[in-house]
Amino acid sequence: ESIRFVLSKNPEDIRGEVGKALQFYKRNFEKPDDIDMFNRMDKKSPMEPVLYNIIKQTPFYKENEGKIEIIPQFDIGKYIKQLNPLAQIPDYRNDFLLIYRNDFGKTTMVILEYDGFEHHFKDTGFVNDTNFDKFYVAEDIERRKTIESYGYPFIRLNKFLLDDAVTYLNDRLERYCKKKL
């Protein structure tokens, strides 16, 4: 079975419910499939596919899939420099950029990172699930604050959050993407 659309104008130029439906089909048709997403992830990071699957398990994602775009290995530093050539930001690359477009045309972009224990924490012998946020290496704190200073919310996940990662991530996505206009 298949559906074929022959249009005389772009789906974005069609208003009303028909326009929304056509735009939904267009976004989903253009959206990369999971295999393409996995191929674009960092092969040296075994947790990126895990984070991607956690994103897809959240109620927020399931309810808004047609309004969400996920970009793996996003060069946020280069992107910010394109928008503002005077920006003083290193060429940061993040695990994922999640773009959410609400029904009113507002776009929210959120940076998502999985922090591996051995690379992102200092004094690892003292780190546990109650204090991990105090043991991030200085570079990670600076990176997060720099990116947030340009208006991009930053969500970090790590091994201490995996037991309830779907709920944790869902709460933050709801907070950043569904905040009142």
Locate each region found by the language model:
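Nucleic-acid endo/exonuclease domains
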Residues: E1-L181
